[in-house]
Amino acid sequence: MWLCPLALTLILMAASGAACEVKDVCVGSPGIPGTPGSHGLPGRDGRDGVKGDPGPPGPMGPPGETPCPPGNNGLPGAPGVPGERGEKGEAGERGPPGLPAHLDEELQATLHDFRHQILQTRGALSLQGSIMTVGEKVFSSNGQSITFDAIQEACARAGGRIAVPRNPEENEAIASFVKKYNTYAYVGLTEGPSPGDFRYSDGTPVNYTNWYRGEPAGRGKEQCVEMYTDGQWNDRNCLYSRLTICEF
C-alpha cells in the first residue's frame, strides 16, 4: 500500500514539467514581464564641475552721470630745443658826460691821502719783513704752510697770485722769505703736458729757471715746484704743505 503515494508523487512531477534536484532546489521557467513602474523621485544634485574659461568682455556701459574731478598735474616735460638767437638790439642813448677828474678837488685830495697811506703801510711792512718790493712787484708772506691749491686760493682772495720769479732779483726776494721762516715754499709753476715741461699759471713757457742739479726728475709724478732755502728749485708733489708767498 505504500507504493500508491510514491506513484502519485511521480505522476504529479511529470505533469508539471518541473525537474527537482537532489538538493530540493526547483528552477521554474521565466514568467510574463510585468507592467512598467511609475517614475521615481528626483535624485540629489551632483558635485560642482571644473571652472570654465572666462567669457568674452561685455559691451561698454553708458557714461556715468557724475563727472570725475581732474587728475593731478603730470611731470614736467623735457626742455625744448633752444630757439634761434635774436637780433642785436639798438644801442642805448649816450649818458651825460662825467665830471673831469681835475675839477673834482675833493676826489683828488682823497686819492692823494690814500696813496700816502699805502706808501706808509708798505714801508712799515717792509721793515717788519712781511713784504718785499722788487721793481713793480710786491711779494708778501703770512708765514703759514699749506698745499699748492690752498696757496693759490689764499693769494687770489687777497687780490694777488702765488709768487713766481721771472729773474734772479725776484728769485732772491722769494728766497729771503724761505730763509726767514726756514721752510720751503712753492712757486707759481706747474708741469705741462710733457714731463719736465714746467710753465707759468697762464700756460706760457718759463723764461727763467734756477733748478737744483739733476732736477726736475719727477718724470710727470711731481707737478709743482718748491724753492729751497738757497733759492734753488726742485719739482715736488703738490699735496705737501709749503710756505705761502704771494705777489701783487
From Swiss-Prot:
Question: Outcome of altering G231V?
Answer: In ILD2; the mutant protein is retained in the endoplasmic reticulum and is not secreted
Q: Give all residue intervals belonging to the C-type lectin domain.
A: 132-248
Gene3D superfamilies per UniProt: Mannose-Binding Protein A, subunit A
Where is it located? Answer: Secreted; Secreted, Extracellular space, Extracellular matrix; Secreted, Extracellular space, Surface film
Q: How is it modified after translation?
A: N-acetylated.
List compositional bias (Low complexity) regions by residue number: 71-82
Where is the segment annotated Disordered?
33-101
Q: Which cysteines are joined by disulfide bonds?
A: C155-C246, C224-C238
Picking any one GO biological process from the record gives: respiratory gaseous exchange by respiratory system
List every position bearing 4-hydroxyproline. Answer: P30, P33, P36, P42, P54, P57, P63, P67, P70
Q: Indicate the secretion signal residues.
A: 1-20
The family database entries (Pfam families) matched by this protein are listed as: Lectin_C (PF00059)
**Comp. bias intervals (Basic and acidic residues):** 42-51, 84-93
Oligomer status and interactors: Oligomeric complex of 6 set of homotrimers.
Protein name per its UniProtKB record: Pulmonary surfactant-associated protein A2
The organism encoding this protein is Homo sapiens (Human)
